[in-house]
Amino acid sequence: MVGKARSSNFTLSEKLDLLKLVKPYVKILEEHTNKHSVIVEKNRCWDIIAVNYNAIGVDRPPRTAQGLRTLYKRLKEYAKQELLQQKETQSDFKSNISEPTKKVMEMIPQISSFCLVRDRNHIQSANLDEEAQAGTSSLQVMLDHHPVAITVEVKQEEDIKPPPPLVLNSQQSDTLEQREEHELVHVMERSLSPSLSSVDMRMTSSPSSIPRRDDFFRHESGEHFRSLLGYDPQILQMLKEEHQIILENQKNFGLYVQEKRDGLKRRQQLEEELLRAKIEVEKLKAIRLRHDLPEYNSL
């Protein structure tokens, strides 16, 4: 059995030998795709690499293809981390980078570009964090001073705009009632507030003087209802006919629903009867089949 488990850690010479064996197949191994043919080709390459690696030295412990593949991935990750660390410290690459990392950079030049992109993203994220902190601090300062401004504005509004008078003299109340009665005869709105502002709002916003039918039924007083209609028997007759039509439609709809429910019940009963009949037929067929068999006839 070849190398069930690794007996010791990889030495520097073993790592360099692995990278030397991987170099001819690096183009296939670095092709990141889920195609079945590529995966099969990668497995074949790793089997060849494992055979060549185990044939280098007898004194070394045998390694599996999976173990060598794991080591190769770790070497690439370590190379990325080492490059990022060197860029952060701004030291010389050639003097401080290890030999496996140099080999990985020669085989895979994309690693250096990956580090540059990652470094740029790190700088951008740091700038965004600084901007967010600055925005938060400025917002906190604004919130600290903003309540005072709100208090001043409210006080100014209270000083400029006096409260509406709650007590009206008799002449003003009579004029208000006359205007309200005149307006209610011609315009029916949703609100019948006796205040002056609501009356003015209805006068400016209502485009027509045709009364609305849905507001006629809101009043409980019969006299008030008849006064709004202006004792017009034609309107009363139309409303009565419309009400009768609505009741008739509701009645017909109820009958339709009841008939549909009865039809569904009848259908379910017929289906149950049909199922029972089929069961009886199958039983009769089974009895006839048993009687036709020779073993039953002999009995």
UniProtKB/Swiss-Prot annotation:
InterPro entries: FSBP, Myb_DNA-bind_5. It is found in: Nucleus. The keyword Protein biosynthesis does not apply. There is a cross-link at K94 (Glycyl lysine isopeptide (Lys-Gly) (interchain with G-Cter in SUMO2)). GO terms for molecular function: identical protein binding. One of its GO terms (cellular component) is nucleus. The keyword Transcription regulation applies. It holds the Pfam family Myb_DNA-bind_5. Keywords: Isopeptide bond, Nucleus, Repressor, Transcription, Transcription regulation, Ubl conjugation. Disulfide bonds: none annotated. Expressed in multiple tissues including brain. Transcriptional repressor that down-regulates the expression of the fibrinogen gamma chain. Represses transcription of GSK3B gene promoter via its interaction with APBA1. Interacts with APBA1 (via PDZ 1 and 2 domains). Intragenic, in the second intron of RAB54B gene. This is Fibrinogen silencer-binding protein. It comes from Homo sapiens (Human). The gene is FSBP.
